[in-house]
Amino acid sequence: MKTRITEMLGIEYPIIQGGMAWVAEHHLAAAVSEAGGLGLIGGANAPGEVVREEIRKARELTDKPFGVNVMLLSPHADDVAKVVVEEGIKVVTTGAGNPEKYMDMWKAAGVKVIPVVASVALARRMEKYGADAVVAEGMESGGHIGEETTMTLVPQVVDAVSIPVIAAGGIGDGRGIAAAFMLGAEAVQIGTRFVVSKESIVHENYKERIIKAKDIDSTVTGRTHGHPVRCLRNQMTREYIKLEQEGKSFEELEYLTLGTLRKAVQEGDVKNGTVMAGQIAGLISKEQTCKEMIGEMMGQAEKLLGRC
């Protein structure tokens, strides 16, 4: 399946793996790229040299294209932005901030820049800054979210910009991919399903929690102070929401969650850690290789789109 995104990025399938903090490291990124999609290394709050090491390790596992997600609010964002150029990375996705200050440097180095957006206004602004494409991410996704659903956001962004649009949020099988294409997207970004891939280094408890999740198992914390995060319900989210309803300050609530994502991902504490996952978790029932996942999803999507 060829689109402007597959041509631009040099990939076989229009599937991009989300740049998830503590999850999107070199093993996963390389596996997705080897399977024909675009793997991403999640920069998160990591120092530049850590990201550099991840890039080099990924290159030992694949010679296919992969990218880096740069979290712009990270205290290390300046260093990571430079490392991307120094290491010859050709695709960057961005989130949590404005990439404008890095655009000239990245464009001069031939880097394709793809910001994640949660509104039409932001998509237009990113196109004005010179973005090559945008990821329109709905609130069904795991982690930090906006207010619009994927179903409503994607077609509005498609109508508003001339650059390619990648749909994200609530996509975990071929039906979701086909639906995104019918809305005008030219690729999809998938996170939660890849978390449970065999190549993912996430703790087995985390994977099992996603696989056993039901349709109503996700919740959103942080709405009160304008920092909504979608994750799976557990003791930590219940305590957070209770304190939120009691009117606790952002600082008090932030303290409660410090280190909890790492606790869940690396230590397997899915009761007191933050188990970030999208609403699609209820649809995920097994652990597979990235190659199996992508083959299954694309086969289903192509069959459905062939009926149209």
Give the residues covered by each predicted segment.
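Active-site entrance/lid segments in N-terminal catalytic domains of soluble metabolic enzymes
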Residues: 1-164
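Residue-level detector of alpha-helix initiation sites
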Residues: 23, 171-172
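Conserved active-site-proximal phosphate/metal-binding subdomains
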Residues: 152-166, 172-308
